[in-house]
Curated annotation (Swiss-Prot):
GO biological process, one term: quorum sensing
Cytoplasm listed as a keyword: no
DNA-binding region: 181-200
InterPro entries per record: Sig_transdc_resp-reg_C-effctor (IPR016032), TF_LuxR_autoind-bd_dom (IPR005143), TF_LuxR_autoind-bd_dom_sf (IPR036693), Tscrpt_reg_LuxR_C (IPR000792), WH-like_DNA-bd_sf (IPR036388)
Stated role: Probable transcriptional activator. Binds to an autoinducer molecule.
Family recorded in the similarity comment: Belongs to the autoinducer-regulated transcriptional regulatory protein family.
Protein name per UniProt: Transcriptional activator protein YukR
Keyword terms of this UniProt record: Activator, DNA-binding, Quorum sensing, Transcription, Transcription regulation
Natural source organism: Yersinia ruckeri
Superkingdom of the source species: Bacteria
UniProt GO MF annotations: DNA binding
Name of the encoding gene: yukR
Keyword Cell division: no
HTH luxR-type domain boundaries: 157-222
Length: 229
């Protein structure tokens, strides 16, 4: 996601997927601090978030300020304190309703001090950004399908292997447990340089931009297999 947004000066973003049959089931990848995502999901703010409620009724992208009701609802909602804390005051949301009855959204946040031309750039590039959301969501569904295939004893990869090699899985597992690269190297009996190499491969395979996001995605999608010691 980060790479796809570099051409727009890397605005803050949230990619969110909600099961429309069971809105409690929500998945979030965001550039915000973990605290924001933890509070949002633990409080089930997707049920009252005016951006989400608007997206449920839309199939086209929308600017938050195109409809004064959205911003006024945001300010009157319980979510406002959280939004204000992280300076989430205005933005642009792209919407996708998929074949599995999910609502997927990519929201780009417009900071108060943002480039004045950013809004017009996003407006003129709506088609490209909408396609980015489609590609991002398709990648997520493929990762999810891979996870389900492994858990069912069936592998969706024609090579007979999971999306991560055993060593990549081991590195990601220990990283998700809070181990540093030197500690992982000691546990796995490899060099720190090799640990970094494997983590780099994990980042590429998961389509994220850094190890922190790879760990979060691996945990969220339950892609990490237990490692026996």
């Amino acid at each position: 996601i980060d790479r796809k947004l570099e051409r727009y000066d890397s605005p803050r973003y949230t990619y969110m997927v909600i099961d429309k049959k069971n809105p409690v089931d929500v998945f979030i990848v965001t550039s915000y601090p973990d605290e924001w995502a933890d509070i949002y999901t633990s409080q089930n703010y997707q049920h009252i978030d005016p951006i989400v409620l608007t997206a449920f009724k839309r199939i086209s992208p929308f600017a938050w300020d195109e409809n004064i009701t959205i911003l006024s609802d945001l300010k009157s909602s319980k979510i406002f304190a959280l939004s204000k804390k992280y300076n989430i005051v205005n933005g642009f949301t792209f919407v996708l309703h998929d074949h599995m009855n999910n609502l997927a959204m990519l929201s780009l946040i417009m900071d108060n001090n943002a480039d004045k031309g950013l809004n017009s750039r996003i407006e003129s590039d709506k088609d490209r950004l909408q396609m980015n959301l489609i590609k991002i969501h398709e990648k997520m569904l493929m990762l999810e399908q891979n996870k389900l295939g492994v858990s069912n004893g069936k592998n969706t990869d024609t090579s007979g292997k999971g999306i991560l090699s055993p060593r990549e899985n081991e590195v990601l597992h220990w990283a998700s447990m809070g181990k540093t690269y030197p500690e992982i190297a000691l546990i796995a009996g490899i060099t720190t340089r090799t640990v970094k190499h494997h983590m780099g491969n994990v980042v590429k395979k998961l389509g994220v931009i850094n190890a922190r996001q790879a760990i979060r995605l691996g945990v969220e999608l339950e892609l990490i297999k237990p490692v026996l010691v």
